[in-house]
């Protein structure tokens, strides 16, 4: 079971976000996005990072990526960009970013968050992090109830992310507390498929994602109806 801790309303957080090389990102969007697929992947990541940086509880956003274009744009937004080490998968990359975060801010909590949350609201992220401050290890499930969009640990707690297919069950099995809080729709709405993006657009995405989607016929008003 998750260990409940004394609640620290003043706890700040370092967030680690992984960003794939754009050439390999959003492949399930290839048909809908066409030649704008890579630009869409970058827009989604940029809107996610920008929203996270506006959250008052977030002291730092660390982006783990080897993509030079993504690195330049996300660094310009204010994120700290580090290379993907040891370059052997998602969870090791997150652990690398978390180690750097703890070296810089040992008294901050550390979270790993999806970079695919273009509708993210800073206030919703803040509510989740405030709840996470009350537990040693916690997570937020995705909108499908199968994956994870946020995994968080308090200072000094081992950082053991288990992202990937079925991560909700894995995080729960290792003792992390699921933060089943109402009103976290934007934090739970990750985007991997055209249907996911339509759901995010309905919530209201950041400006970069909205602008790219407006250029794609698949996401124009009435497109869903026209497919019958």
From Swiss-Prot:
<dbReference type="Pfam" id="PF01983">
    <property type="entry name" value="CofC"/>
</dbReference>
<comment type="pathway">
    <text>Cofactor biosynthesis; coenzyme F420 biosynthesis.</text>
</comment>
<keyword id="KW-0342">GTP-binding</keyword>
<feature type="binding site">
    <location>
        <position position="167"/>
    </location>
    <ligand>
        <name>phosphoenolpyruvate</name>
    </ligand>
</feature>
<dbReference type="InterPro" id="IPR029044">
    <property type="entry name" value="Nucleotide-diphossugar_trans"/>
</dbReference>
<keyword id="KW-0808">Transferase</keyword>
<comment type="similarity">
    <text>Belongs to the CofC family.</text>
</comment>
<dbReference type="GO" id="GO:0052645">
    <property type="term" value="P:F420-0 metabolic process"/>
</dbReference>
<feature type="binding site">
    <location>
        <position position="164"/>
    </location>
    <ligand>
        <name>phosphoenolpyruvate</name>
    </ligand>
</feature>
<dbReference type="GO" id="GO:0043814">
    <property type="term" value="F:phospholactate guanylyltransferase activity"/>
</dbReference>
<dbReference type="GO" id="GO:0005525">
    <property type="term" value="F:GTP binding"/>
</dbReference>
<comment type="function">
    <text>Guanylyltransferase that catalyzes the activation of phosphoenolpyruvate (PEP) as enolpyruvoyl-2-diphospho-5'-guanosine, via the condensation of PEP with GTP. It is involved in the biosynthesis of coenzyme F420, a hydride carrier cofactor.</text>
</comment>
<protein>
    <recommendedName>
        <fullName>Phosphoenolpyruvate guanylyltransferase</fullName>
        <ecNumber>2.7.7.105</ecNumber>
    </recommendedName>
</protein>
<keyword id="KW-0547">Nucleotide-binding</keyword>
<keyword id="KW-0548">Nucleotidyltransferase</keyword>
<dbReference type="InterPro" id="IPR002835">
    <property type="entry name" value="CofC"/>
</dbReference>
<feature type="binding site">
    <location>
        <position position="148"/>
    </location>
    <ligand>
        <name>phosphoenolpyruvate</name>
    </ligand>
</feature>
């Amino acid at each position: 079971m998750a260990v409940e801790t004394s609640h620290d309303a003043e706890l700040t957080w370092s967030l680690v976000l992984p960003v794939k090389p754009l050439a390999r990102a959003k492949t399930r969007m290839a048909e809908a996005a066409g030649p704008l697929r890579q630009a869409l992947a970058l827009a989604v990541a940029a809107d996610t990072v920008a929203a996270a940086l506006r959250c008052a509880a977030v002291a730092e956003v660390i982006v783990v990526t080897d993509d030079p274009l993504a690195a330049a744009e996300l660094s310009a937004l204010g994120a700290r960009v580090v290379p993907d080490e040891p370059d052997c998968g998602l969870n090791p990359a997150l652990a690398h970013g978390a180690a750097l975060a703890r070296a810089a801010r040992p008294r901050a909590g550390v979270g790993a968050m999806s970079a695919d949350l273009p509708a993210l609201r800073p206030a919703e992220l803040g509510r989740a992090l405030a709840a996470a401050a009350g537990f040693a290890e916690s997570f937020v499930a995705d909108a499908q109830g199968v994956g994870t969009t946020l995994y968080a640990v308090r200072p000094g707690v081992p950082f053991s992310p288990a992202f990937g297919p079925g991560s909700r069950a894995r995080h729960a099995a290792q003792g992390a507390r699921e933060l089943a809080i109402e009103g976290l729709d934007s934090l739970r709405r990750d985007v991997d498929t055209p249907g996911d993006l339509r759901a995010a657009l309905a919530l209201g995405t950041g400006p970069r994602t909205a602008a790219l989607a407006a250029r794609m016929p698949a996401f124009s008003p009435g497109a869903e109806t026209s497919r019958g």
